[in-house]
């Protein structure tokens, strides 16, 4: 399937949200870009929700989002529903990766939703409410950002434990380690066979091609390689953590 990987260790469904497109926008434009990222993940992962025992009402919500006919309210609910459906479909916890979250951080995460806050602030609260409510449904949540302070505040307000990590930390390597064989398969797909060392560093959260890149799809997706599946392979047992990578 398009969002799952299996090897001798373990495998988990992966949701990847890239908010980079929202970085240059404000207010409603940024909120639309965030919802667009959720819609694209609904479309990408919809084929994995074919199990007959899943809630048809919830699957229809994801279908509406994937077709681009869902309301903003439905899209805002889609992430939590997607986590629930993926866990039920594969009987596994879900991995949630969010890239460039801080590019659209609202100014007041502690503001009350009394009509005075804009849609971006409401979306931010919705995102962290979803993470908190998902609980044990999430194996790992990784918020990749330059300024983790907003995420730390939001998580602490909800009583959610987290751990900050730099890209070079051994803790990050433990969760995001890839075998040389896995790295070589990706390189073969994109015609970079001789770049094993560089690619290995990138896949553990470093650099590839001289620029920072934290989402595998940014390198692989443009080649439309059918063999690539969104992947996070875990080699260590432990609690479900939240990580902010700076």
Residue spans for each PLM region:
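Conserved P-loop NTPase "ATPase switch" module shared by AAA+ and STAND
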Residues: 90-117
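Short glycine-rich substrate-engagement loop in P-loop NTPases that contacts/grips substrate
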Residues: 65-83
